[in-house]
């Protein structure tokens, strides 16, 4: 188990992580018609205020483990879409991550009055993690006939 560090995302982190995304994350992006690299670079395209993107790296090798953040919706910078995309390196460091991730969620929450996102029902581990974090789920939605 390696120590994990968090720093502000730079585009190179996105280029590093995109080809190594977990298959469940690639699947979920595909449901929305998104390419992994485009999705990871999306926060850099926004000119809105209150955009946050952070990278989790292994301390020893500086390997990108995950990228996460929140982006405000178009007409209200206090309502955000939260997201988290990771590589298989997260599994190797999952307990370390779990013990330290709540402070980053609290940081994102401080910047918004409401955070939301959509998740596929196949993403069971993330659903458990989100519930553990205190997120509430609404009724299922049909997306593009999937």
Per-segment meaning from a language model:
Residues 2-19, 25, 30:
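A short beta-loop-alpha structural element at the N-terminal edge
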Residues 93-107, 128, 132:
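Conserved acetyl-CoA-binding loop-helix of GNAT-fold acetyltransferases
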Residues 68-77:
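A conserved beta-strand-loop-helix scaffold within acyl/acetyltransferase catalytic domains
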Residues 30-51:
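Active-site rim helix/loop that mediates acceptor-substrate recognition in acyltransferases
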Residues 3, 113-116:
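Short active-site oxyanion
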Residues 77-92, 96-97:
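Conserved acetyl-CoA binding element of GNAT-fold acetyltransferases
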Residues 50-69:
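Conserved beta-hairpin
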Residues 115-131, 136, 142-145:
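Conserved beta-strand-loop-alpha-helix junction that forms the acyl-donor binding cleft
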């Amino acid at each position: 188990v390696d120590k994990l560090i968090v720093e502000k995302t730079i585009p190179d982190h996105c280029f590093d992580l995109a080809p190594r995304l977990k298959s469940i994350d690639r699947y979920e992006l595909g449901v929305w018609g998104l390419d992994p690299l485009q999705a990871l670079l999306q926060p850099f395209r926004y000119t809105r205020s209150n955009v946050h993107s952070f990278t989790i790296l292994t301390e020893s090798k500086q390997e990108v483990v995950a990228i996460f953040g929140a982006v405000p919706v178009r007409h209200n910078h206090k309502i955000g879409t939260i997201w988290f995309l990771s590589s298989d390196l997260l599994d190797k460091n999952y307990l370390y991550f779990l013990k330290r991730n709540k402070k980053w969620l609290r940081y994102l929450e401080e910047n918004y009055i409401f955070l939301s996102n959509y998740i596929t029902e196949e993403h069971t581990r993330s659903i458990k993690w989100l519930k553990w974090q205190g997120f509430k789920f609404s009724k299922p939605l049909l997306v593009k006939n999937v």
